């Protein structure tokens, strides 16, 4: 990714300009999330940079200010900056804390990539879904309107999703192409992972309701 398109560099430059600091930083990236998976890797990177540099450079901006800066980089950035599980409204900037059970997840990426721009601009995408209220939300009844559109046009996603559902509750991430399956134990997730086809990227992760980055920064600031 060229620097002008890299959210890490963009986030650092925005913070520099906002705070008038002349300080800099070097970045080393260890890529773990699959490309084009719909897991918010770019947004998470941007949020991490804003939070870490705010501490490193001692610019001491409040979280709400960092979230506003992050919103200009992407709708998903604020939730990573706030660092807690949340019910999102608007374009993603209106957050209400929401703490589901911390399950284990098998995350799989079929051998394809999905264009987020194409999905959001598609005339086939459902746009009249009833609005959900945090007070009466049942997470089991929620759905991803993008999922039905993606599986209609991408057999790789459709086939993998159908296979995973036989083992555990499974859904697509965002606009895809990753699918996450929910398990009560890491052993259960790993057992199914061993059965996956060789061309499917996968990893097992534990759901967490609070960001470990926030905890680490609190320790540094003590």
Language-model region placement:
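N-terminal beta-alpha supersecondary unit
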Residues: 1-23, 203-220
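Short pre-catalytic strand/loop immediately N-terminal to key active-site residues, enriched for Gly-Thr
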Residues: 25-37, 170
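DPxDG-like acidic metal-binding loop motif
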Residues: 8, 37-65
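ATP-dependent small-molecule kinase catalytic core of the GHMP/sugar-kinase superfamily
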Residues: 59-169, 182-222
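Conserved hydrophobic residues forming the short capping helix/wall of the S-adenosyl-L-methionine
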Residues: 12-16, 54, 168, 193-196
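Conserved glycine-rich beta-strand-loop-beta hairpin in the small C-terminal domain of fold type I
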Residues: 176-179
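Conserved active-site and cofactor/substrate-binding residues in soluble primary-metabolism enzymes
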Residues: 3-10, 44, 114, 155
